[in-house]
Amino acid sequence: MSAHGTNEGALWGGRFESGPAAAMAALSKSTHFDWVLAPYDVRASQAHARVLHKAGLLGDEDLASMLDGLGRLAADVASGEFVPSESDEDVHGALERGLIDRVGPEVGGRLRAGRSRNDQVATLFRMWLRDAVRRVAAGVLDVVDALATQAAAHPSAVMPGKTHLQAAQPVLLAHHLLAHTHPLLRDVQRLRDFDVRAAVSPYGSGALAGSSLGLDPEAIAAELDFDSSAENSIDATSSRDFAAEAAFVLAMIGVDLSRMAEEVILWSTPEFGYITLADAWSTGSSIMPQKKNPDVSELTRGKSGRLIGNLTGLLATLKAQPLAYNRDLQEDKEPVFDSVAQLELLLPAITGLVSTLEFHTDRMAELAPAGFTLATDIAEWLVRQGVPFRVAHEAAGACVRVAEARGVGLEDLTDDELAGVDPALTPDVREVLTVEGSIASRNARGGTAGIRVAEQLGGVRQLSESLREWCR
């Protein structure tokens, strides 16, 4: 028997006379994706060694030797000198092999006492994910800050607000840009909330029933920066709701980015003409020399579907698994790893795109009153004069009909035409028949009036900075 047992590169084997068939080994192998957990595995092993020593299961010399070996192994993993071999089943088996190669089987073989791959991988996955979501959150906040900077640069620019993609009411461009920051800020808050639930360590739960060796799960939890250890060992080793929760928030970020990306695509068309994309954040055509394509936005739309697919695939994997651990859970990591990787590609590109958008404010101002976007202002002006809204709504609609028949805007109707629709429509109504007047009148909290948008911008920046403290 070799120093590594009857099944080198795996953490099992004594029950078996020989190793697995080649097809079985290929099916079981996970080092091609779980190697990203290697630094966390080494760190957790160092904590585990100290707990074994505290419990009297590892002598002083063996502890020193083991920690020295783990330190050298960590350095070799970081440098790329130590990598999985073809025989390694997973990251855990590879690292145990690496440790034994450095300190020998007598010392290296003691590390496995009191822990199972079941509690080990559940812990490492949480550790990795807690770090990963902070990186993602920081990237989301970069997008938020880019939007806020653009909003601050265009404090009085106006544009047509839309519902159903049809002209609705005029709004400030800054108000529209900030509307994209709020869902993204909520996404970061969701990641922060997720972290509270993820900060519970499964370590010490063993395969499913806990440990009989007098180990201290709370000590390991504290050393690995968890808030506490798990209360139920079965739940700790078999639950992956933390992964599903993270996958949902990552997918939601993709959805929120895709909504903004769709607008960038539309706004950059000649039909809209709101924006010009920077050369650095667009591409050309292999046959049409005039093209300037919004590939960042289109890839964002596409990758948002991928993130949703990762979420639904993970949920399908988790569905109907009996307690406790099942090998199905080998499939839990790749969807989440991929979602994080896709967002780490997307977020810097979206930030660069937003930061360099050139807004054509004259074009937006020209279109702001188009489509009779001031009709609601007529109705609400009448309400302020004491006219019931039902009547006011009818009168405003009649004004639209008259203007449409003449081929003019509402602001071009004569005093006689307005009075002919409703005597209450005196010349004073013209105070709201301008885009600027309409916007200024919407000064309730959350409205598009400049004073409210300025307050909102300050709040967005303050919240973004506060959330960055958590990311660090």
Swiss-Prot record:
EC numbers for this chain: 4.3.2.1
Origin superkingdom: Bacteria
Known pathway: Amino-acid biosynthesis; L-arginine biosynthesis; L-arginine from L-ornithine and carbamoyl phosphate: step 3/3
An example molecular function term from Gene Ontology annotations: argininosuccinate lyase activity
UniProtKB keywords: Amino-acid biosynthesis, Arginine biosynthesis, Cytoplasm, Lyase
GO CC annotations on file: cytosol
Annotated catalysed reactions: 2-(N(omega)-L-arginino)succinate = fumarate + L-arginine
Subcellular location: Cytoplasm
Gene3D superfamilies noted in UniProt: Fumarase/aspartase (C-terminal domain) (1.10.40.30), Fumarase/aspartase (Central domain) (1.20.200.10), Fumarase/aspartase (N-terminal domain) (1.10.275.10)
Keyword Lyase among record annotations: yes
Primary localisation category: cytoplasm
GO biological process, one term: L-arginine biosynthetic process
UniProt cross-references to InterPro entries, sorted A to Z: Arg_succ_lyase_C, Argininosuccinate_lyase, Fumarase/histidase_N, Fumarate_lyase_CS, Fumarate_lyase_fam, Fumarate_lyase_N, L-Aspartase-like
Alphabetical list of NCBIfam families matching this protein: argH
PANTHER family the record matches: ARGININOSUCCINATE LYASE
Family under the similarity heading: Belongs to the lyase 1 family. Argininosuccinate lyase subfamily.
Database matches in HAMAP family: Arg_succ_lyase
Protein name: Argininosuccinate lyase
Organism: Rhodococcus jostii (strain RHA1)
Higher taxonomy: Bacteria, Bacillati, Actinomycetota, Actinomycetes, Mycobacteriales
